[in-house]
Amino acid sequence: MMEEYQEINKILHEIDDGNTKRKVQLVKNKKDGKLYVCKTIDFNNNNETKDSKVKREREYLFLKQYSSPSFSHLNIAKYIKHFETRDNHGYLQKLTIIIEYYEGGDLTNLKNLNEVLPKDIIYLFFTMLVILKEFKNSIIHRDIKPENIFFVKNGPDLEFYLGDMGSSSMVITDQKNTLIGTNQYMAPEIDLGGYTCKVDIYSLGKTMLSLITLVHSPMNSIFESLFQLCTLENFKIRPSIDQLIEFVCRQYDQSRYTISLSSYTHPNTRSIIKYFKDKKFNILKEGEKINFKIDIQSKFYNCISVYRGFAYNEYIVEEEEKEKEEYQKEENQQSIPNVLSIVELIQPPLQDLSKDFENVLINHINYIRDGGINGSIRSLLHPDIIIKTKCDRVKGFEIKAHSNITNTEGLFIENAHLIYKPVNLSWKKIFLEREDEITPDVQLKAVFLSLLVAFKISNDENDFLTGTLFDKLMEHIYFVKSPSLPPPSQISPIKEPLSSYELKISFPFNHRAHIYGVKVPLNPNYLNLFFGGEIKDTLISNLIQTLNILAPNNLQYKSILIKLISIILKEEKRILKSYSNLGLEIYFKEFNEIIKNEIALEGIVSDKLLVSKIDTTKKIEKIRGFRNGHSNSDADIYISEFKGKYYAIDKFEHIPGLFEILEPFSNKAIDDFNQHFKFISTFVDVNESFGLVYTIFELPSSLINSYQTTRKSCENKNILDKDKTFRNLLNQHLSYYQNIQNNRYKLNGTDLTSKKLSFTEYQYNIIISNDCDIHYYFSFVGKNGSGLVQSFFDIGAWVYGDENVKKIKVLSFFYLLQCLFDYQTKNTHNSVDIDFPNILYYLKKFYYSSLVDYGLNGMDSSSKIFNYDLNNSYSFIKIGFLIYNILDLYKPNIIPDQTLYYDSDLIVMLLENSSNKFLCFRKQYYSDLDKTKLKLTPENIVPQNNDNDNSIILLPLLIIKDDITSFHFFDYNLKDSIKTIEDFNNEKECLLYYLQNIQKNPSNANSLVLINLNLFEENESTDNESFLFFDIFYLIKQLHGLSTIIDSWDNFISSLSKPISLVSNYIQTNLKKILDDPLSIDILYNDESMSHFKPFIYDKIKEIKKNVWLIRDKNNNNYIRKLSGYIKSKFKEVEKYGFEFIDDVSISNPYLKIAVENGWPISFLSSHFKRDNSNLFDYLFNKELIILELLKEKGVDGISQLESYFVENNIIYILTKYHGDYSNLEEINELNQEDLFEILVQMSDKLKILESLQIYHRDIKPENILFKREIVNGNIQSKVCLIDFSISDFGFILKTNESGSKMYQAPEIYQEEYRSKENDITNQHYKLDIYSLGFTLSHLMKKFNCNPPSLVQIVKKMIKHKAFLLKQPTL
């Protein structure tokens, strides 16, 4: 009984179709603790026929039958047991079935897996074929879809099971014309009446096509073509289960020695093939077989496989029977090599690296994913050429092969280059079939040839192609009679000894979607070509063993190949003696030449050689911060050793064109700046991920053993020792800088002393040795004005740690000064000038504060560096033509903005101009700054007037601004009184006061203000003044999730008072806090200017359905509150609500077009569409709000009435009238003939009005029609009200929209043959709402056993399946 199972609070599925209630949920067996699926079916319709009651038992009978041991080969959800309750007549009332639980879930969960492989998709298809073959003469499933197929992970593989037999039908006993199934996967003939087991073929094809999008690895496109055939609408030409089985068996046989074999690598796929063959399911007459034809160079082949690679298409084909017969007749042959691999190169070969194979160089091809199974390759050398990587969809049984290359001029290239590879002569096939004839010399030739080819590619500096060779396991070796491959029809089967044949290599095209530049992992089994066979020479065993040792070390491929060739040459004498005159001499000649060239090259220290000798375990940390604008992912320099010399190698990611712009360092070397690191060269390697640039220096001897950095030792020092270390490093740094400034150096004839701060104009790096000595080197020449300023902060961060350094005010000063001084900003809206005395002025603060803190008497000996008069030496900032000394810099306590390149969106500056001092807030709105200097105009300089009656709001004294940056000046004496929202928790009052100020002074809306906190009640007793820094943009960022600037401030201000705005959202969301605060209530209810901000106060009464509530306002009025949209910027936060039916609303929205064309009043649209594109408050609505406003404007009666709408917690809600005295038609217990006619008449009137407005309700059903009877003037009258427009839409955009309740939907909504017509739906003659109304009336007539003939005739016309072909009844 069910007592042995414990329910788990996880309902998987629940549905009530009026006759039955189905609930599927997880349960746990109390004894073994295992999870199972419990399917409970309640049969609650007492009016159903005897036959329908008998059919109730079919599901568990089917499950029970196919769960028996005799059907163990079928992957069907396993029946465990069932429980039943029967009525007095013995019919089922309640059925509970316990089924095996599959932890992966259904196929819709496959998208959560990291990768779905082609072998999984093919195995799933084979598994379903086994089941459908078993069902063929007895059962039709009728509801195959992803939701009814379940999977579990079995190690790296997937296992699949077909479930939900509830829709299944017996072939013999049932007339198969019932509308059972799922819209998207339902075969068209089901709706037309009369169908066969081919409906399951259709559903399976649809399911497989939906799953292909999850496969990111290249897949044999023939299978997609096969799945397309399964979904042909004409079931007469749709393939049968027997045809499909014969095709896949033949496909497997023809693909055994090709790249297509990877499709069949699931461990159970081959057992299914064997099962089909043992049962002789794979035998069909020739005329019944499925064949895909392909035309290549005017010759037709039967196509077996189609793959798209990076720069090629590969087809596995078989010659047609006619061709085979003619050839056999001419050549008098018994068997012929009729299976070919034809490789079509998209681009002609750029270079032949060997006469034995042809190579396509792809160094400059960058792989780009377009999404789904579509992909493309864009050539960086020729960006106008795009190579498509997805096979064209087939039409019928024919494939047209072409190269799919087009450029912007529309040129088309076909058959750029073809390579014919005879599959029957491949190394793998010959070895497996004639292993006894594979002599030792043949084995050695194969190994030697593969190594030579790999070396030639590697020597051409293409590790990617070498890795491809290593990865393909010799699938590219073929036996041929002559150096060139003859045409396929001339290739004869091998009869002579294999040693008399030549081995040739074609390029090993790799079908896995490697992103360009990613190094293919070395396959340690690369040389093990013998597929478990005997290795017939010890040299090969030695090579394989060596390769297995070297593979895990991540060495460069060329180094591995040199090692292997050296081993081969040690046995040259033995090999040539043992296998004389067998053609091995040519290989040893090549090997000796390779080693000779490598020895000659060792005398020259090449850049590539030094890079190859990098020891990744030996690296030195560099002080960060001097390479802004480039990747800082590698914060170390690496050490390379060669012949006793040590080299420092720095690297960064190569950006195409960057190295050409930055001239090689050797052209601009500054010897004196480079005195610690002697520059060698710069080397670009594009074979690694996106390419790397290596800068090579000679490593100073004092750094050779500095693998352990002082950073680690600093972490254990106390603060006093850290201060000493920092002062020592600063002394070295400043002394070095001073020496450069005091001497004359020339760079390419240019006098550096004529340049101010020349040292800071070049990007350099700092290295600190174990002895705390500073060393410098330049990675490349580039301008960076902030280098020197930033260096003080970075050295401090290195000593104190990233967190503690921010506590040292003087160092934070340099960080913020660097933000102002950065090359991106210094020449734009403001500029900062700084010189040597200015730097020392701020550093002196650190020296003196340290000495005072630790009781030290006087400066140490190194203080002689301060040889300048430091009195009143400041850095200064130019704002337009006004100059201010920078007395101090700091950041307020606000949440950092991580979206900016620098965290420089807000800096507080203490400035001095003559005798006047100011507190200045510098606000930067965008990280990308305008390159035009600020021109001061009357509009730029805005003096402010603080003589207003609002003593709470303190406005700036002066504002200087452009479109990107603004400077707000306040009284200097307020500098110690500033707080932020993070410091103080009175946001609600501050916001409301600020809004109050905006309403009275709109021109001040976009300025930064200070709010006097002492005037709030709880702060009146505070002795010291406190002012809250208030920035409306910062508030928008925190409350609304956006950081932007408003192009039209006036529009923004006017939007604040609209029903849907930042303000109304904030107030409604924080309603409880605001209503608990007397001060907030006073602002909202006693100030007339704030009256439109009053919140909507209501209580929830009950939830009617998801996102729909009955609510009551403070005046006891009842409403229906429905979710209708959301604030667009908060999309990620409200995804959980499910907004499939909500569309973007913009100025180009088609609703405006409808309004204009029909002459409607569009006042109700203005609040939705008259918005600037840059406005923060862009919304997403469903159509319900717009449609209800239109119907309200038109005064349409008997339809759900819109009362109002509001926004809360970023969600837009609409309020409609609550019809408490009505009942929906599904709830009503009694209707008579007059009632049904009244419903028809009133609903027809409403639909006619909706049609005139081009509105389609789309969900007419009993639950959405309200009905009541009332007495008027002594007479009983019936009233009907149509509600729930949540999925309603305008006519001309209805195509392919399948929303709605299936039972009441017109067939054209979900049947493919009626979808996607060329003409708009408005030009077609069907009436989908009429169909739904007809089906509703049909349901009510059956429910209440009321069938007046006239009404029956009308309803029959309303629900004709092909209603669009017939003349509709007049409404």
From Swiss-Prot:
Active site location: D143
Documented EC number(s): 2.7.11.1
Classification via SUPFAM superfamilies: Protein kinase-like (PK-like)
Reactions it catalyzes: L-seryl-[protein] + ATP = O-phospho-L-seryl-[protein] + ADP + H(+); L-threonyl-[protein] + ATP = O-phospho-L-threonyl-[protein] + ADP + H(+)
Record comment regarding domains: The protein kinase domain 2 is predicted to be catalytically inactive.
UniProt cross-references to Pfam families, sorted A to Z: Pkinase (PF00069)
GO CC entries: nucleus
Molecular function GO terms recorded: ATP binding; protein serine kinase activity; protein serine/threonine kinase activity
Residue ranges of every copy of the Protein kinase domain listed in the record: 9-269, 1131-1371
Protein name as catalogued: Probable serine/threonine-protein kinase DDB_G0293292
Keyword match Amino-acid biosynthesis: no
Source organism of this protein record: Dictyostelium discoideum (Social amoeba)
SMART domains (alphabetical): S_TKc (SM00220)
Family the UniProt entry places it in: Belongs to the protein kinase superfamily. Ser/Thr protein kinase family.
Binding site for ATP: I15, D16, D17, G18, N19, T20, K21, R22, K23, K39
Keywords: ATP-binding, Kinase, Nucleotide-binding, Repeat, Serine/threonine-protein kinase, Transferase
